[in-house]
Amino acid sequence: MSSDNQLNYGLDTDTIDIADSVIIDVATKTLGTIPGIHSLSPRFYDELVEGITHAFGQRSLPGINVKHRKDFIEINIYIKALYGYNLIELSKQLQSEIKQTLKNMLDLDHVKVDVHIEGIVKEKEPVLHGN
């Protein structure tokens, strides 16, 4: 992995670079396909942490971050779920869908997805950015 937060796949002399922002985009778009997820849940310190973690090879967006570990990529997702859904099943489905989408689109096999449920929302509550 290069120092600028990209995955590098060497094919003899050819190289393919995948930026962390692409991994975040794929994971974020996958969230919208799963019923029961209300929104990403940004934490109050996300912006402060972003500046610090970026210097150490980590990339994040409020509510989601990517960390490069020795043998795998770790994705932490902080969400608000809709009331009435089985939270364990919802989390497992989100983990599975993100892993499968990253495998299909980016050929990433070694991905750990941690889901953090930060709140429950009634279905009629609007999506508020930053809450």
Residue ranges: model-predicted function:
Residues 1-11, 121-131:
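Short, charged, intrinsically disordered terminal tails
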